[in-house]
């Protein structure tokens, strides 16, 4: 059987944290709390040990991309326009992609004070619920066919080539695309694209999302841990929705604790686990970097593509 990680350099946490540089600016606990997702656990030590060395690595890739653009200009004998450095971040539901994305956005802004650093989630490219209903695939929400891939690829192409674009906004509170609300992306220096599908091959397409990425990260963890984190997040969402009748999750607050847990476990088994095993995890080795989380959400192993 082929070793999936044969093309990766495997690095322990203790070795990885040595790549931290003392002159880097860290974050305060308050800043971390402001970007942390619901049940994700991250502290200043994790930033120092894992994410500041990661910023150093991204700086290397960014510098190499700039050098390549400059060299192409010399070869073609014409100036090349600066293009945004795009970072793709993937992984399962509830694994902590959003926290990692927001943390990198903040650290990149600190590292490159004059740079514009934007972040988008591919949730905004899900078809609206009514379209999914019309297609008969509402129960497949989050699976590859539930995304408007031509729109997503057109967005990446436009941004990569210096254009401005307005994209849809998804709300987890209403569990749908927000009508009339858009996010404008206008010539960023860095763009972070986060979503479960960022490494997947679109059906009948000649372009792939990964064609536009300058760096890519997969957030990995054992399935049993991801399931635990998903169930914990579901309970947190119910608590937040208890007093908000407009929240999608409010309807489930009428359930008993046992009924709610049963629903969450059913959703995990029939949707999220199937999606992870069939569509998300198989794309893992397309990433440039794999960050593996242990039981406590701490990164315990790093795989860097050779």
From Swiss-Prot:
Family matches, as Pfam families: PRK
Pathway linked to the protein: Cofactor biosynthesis; coenzyme A biosynthesis; CoA from (R)-pantothenate: step 1/5
Keywords: ATP-binding, Coenzyme A biosynthesis, Cytoplasm, Kinase, Nucleotide-binding, Transferase
Enzyme Commission designation: 2.7.1.33
Main localization of the protein described in the UniProt heading: cytoplasm
Subcellular location, record wording: Cytoplasm
Binding of ATP, residues: 91-98
Superkingdom of source: Bacteria
GO cellular component, one term: cytoplasm
Enzyme category, top tier: transferase
Any one of the GO BP annotations: coenzyme A biosynthetic process
Catalytic activity: (R)-pantothenate + ATP = (R)-4'-phosphopantothenate + ADP + H(+)
Listed GO MF terms: ATP binding; pantothenate kinase activity
HAMAP family for this protein: Pantothen_kinase_1 (MF_00215)
PANTHER family in the record: URIDINE KINASE (PTHR10285)
Similarity-based family: Belongs to the prokaryotic pantothenate kinase family.
Name recorded for this polypeptide: Pantothenate kinase
